[in-house]
């Protein structure tokens, strides 16, 4: 029975998370970038000087053992300010992940700043030296794997700034909780509590699939 309860716990934890991801797939000329959307995650740009663009560029992000290739980037075209910046509309609180590189490989002072409600949540310098080197099978030289950066955000508007100089962004991904308030545990099952398939406690009038005492019931 303990093994059965463990399987239930694992399933509910997996169901309790979802993700929205913005990637760039097509070339867009400078001054023509408007915005992007992925399942409620919205990226908007302010580009009054017509410098932002999207072009083809291969880069890997992840770790030395687990990484993903991206083939387009959003180029900011300069440092941020009133006429050049990015905002993200966050549909629900969670973890924001993003891939970014400096537009100048030799720059050592270009930072990315993530803020919300005038509070700085993330402020780090972006360096090419942050990448790890991996030798792919059959390759003659190593490939750079750049780090994925993460920050916790709440629902609402998030401001993305690059106050020192131009940066290139490859993706933005938001992982959110689905709002499960209580997870089914072995103790809960033994106490006769009822839950829906998302792991939320329900009352005796609940309809549909209900789990009680470790068993599934369909209630009409």
Give, region by region, the residue ranges found by the protein language model.
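Short edge beta-strand/loop segments characteristic of extracellular beta-sandwich folds
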Residues: 97-101
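Terminal, low-complexity interaction segments
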Residues: 21-54, 60, 105-177
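Bacterial Sec-dependent N-terminal signal peptides
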Residues: 1-21
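Residue-level detector of functionally pivotal "anchor" positions at catalytic/ligand-binding pockets or at interdomain
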Residues: 175-200
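C-terminal tail/sorting-segment detector
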Residues: 2-3, 209-220
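Short beta-strands within extracellular/lumenal beta-sheet-rich domains
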Residues: 64-95, 107-108, 145-149, 166-171
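Structural motif
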Residues: 38, 116, 197, 212-213
